Regions:
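Acidic/polar short surface loop at catalytic or gating sites that assists cofactor/ion binding
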Residues: 101-157
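Conserved acidic catalytic loop of the alpha/beta-hydrolase fold
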Residues: 157-177
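Gly/Ala-rich beta-loop-alpha elbow adjacent to hydrolase catalytic centers
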Residues: 180-189
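Short beta-strand element of the alpha/beta-hydrolase
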Residues: 53-61
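Conserved alpha/beta-hydrolase
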Residues: 76-102
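N-terminal cap/lid segment of alpha/beta-hydrolase-fold proteins
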Residues: 1-51
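Active-site glycine-rich loops that stabilize anionic/oxyanionic intermediates
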Residues: 60-72
């Protein structure tokens, strides 16, 4: 078992925009002059007792959130727990405009678009519904359901620069670290590192 010395969460990076006009406290539905804080990353972190010097920062790929790093679809330990048990502090990121960092400064239309089979194929699990031989992906219905449910829509247009700036703030906040990215997280990761 892992003994956690400390844990918490924070928002990193982001911008503030202000609507034109003058804010009037007496008119709560008049948005003139109001501000919007958005495009920040959300970070959940844990530090085990006697943690190693460098922390590990995990940035997910497209269509995902920090959930990607927590546990596998069948409930086995994910990278977060595996590395905590090996003495690393872990910082699990939801990139701006996704998941728990959903406050966007740009509009987006969220569509209920059926695309489970696209995710199945793009993650190279197999050619839906057949799982490739030799895959560690579990073959039960509940695990597949869990996998599909963890897909997360963008709440604003994906912008590699916005994500990179937020990741720079995460990196600055954590001190000595190693940044680990998955798939579409690689571009912003390279820019931020």
């Amino acid at each position: 078992p892992v003994t956690i010395e400390d844990q918490g969460s924070f928002m990193a990076g982001g911008v503030t925009i202000t609507a034109p006009g003058v804010y009037k406290d007496s008119e709560p539905t008049n948005y003139d002059g109001e501000t919007l804080h958005g495009d920040a990353a959300y970070v959940f972190w844990q530090r085990p007792v006697n943690a190693r010097k460098n922390a590990l920062i995990f940035l997910h790929g497209y269509g995902q959130s920090g959930k990607t790093w927590e546990t596998t679809p069948d409930g086995r330990d994910g990278f977060q727990n595996i590395f905590l048990a090996k003495g690393w502090a872990t910082y699990i990121v939801d990139e701006p405009r996704r998941g728990r960092a959903g406050q966007s400064t740009v509009p987006a239309e969220l569509k209920a678009q059926p695309q489970d089979q696209l995710w199945f194929n793009n993650f190279r699990i197999g050619q839906y519904p057949i799982i490739f031989d030799g895959m560690a992906f579990p073959r039960d219905e509940e695990s597949l359901r869990q996998f599909f449910h963890q897909m997360t829509p963008d709440t604003g247009k994906f912008d590699v620069e916005v994500v990179a700036k937020a990741m720079e703030a995460v990196i600055d906040h954590t001190g000595d670290n190693v940044l680990i990215t998955h798939s579409a997280g690689g571009g912003p990761g390279w820019l931020a590192a």
